[in-house]
Amino acid sequence: MPIDYQRDDQRRLITVTLTDPFTLEELLRQIDRQWAEHTWEYAVLYDTRAVSSATPPVELQQLVEHTLVVGAGQPRGPIGVAIPPRPEVLRRGLQLAELAGPRREIEILLNEAQVNAWLTRHAPRRA
């Protein structure tokens, strides 16, 4: 399955794991799902470490625009994007954060330690 969507209500966390091949439309459906499930303020970790190529800039723009339309200006939870440590993917990750603008909290995560630190800050395990 190219996109795996896991929801953890206790941690207020959604984990979206992408693998090849997936389409932009499939990814946009995950955003629609989050809105429909009333989990817009949950932390979302997009794990793209198993994806072989960087998302084209035009698709990044469509992703950001779709998110803004679906969210209708409502505050969104923090977004973490785990990427493979490759220069072209890092460039696209930074481009995504820039396109999203200052109203969106997007962190690009390069390694497991950064992913774990992000999860600790934004989706701690509760007793």
Regions found by a protein language model. Name each.
Residues 1-127:
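Amphipathic, Lys/Arg-enriched alpha-helical "gate/interface" segment within cytosolic domains
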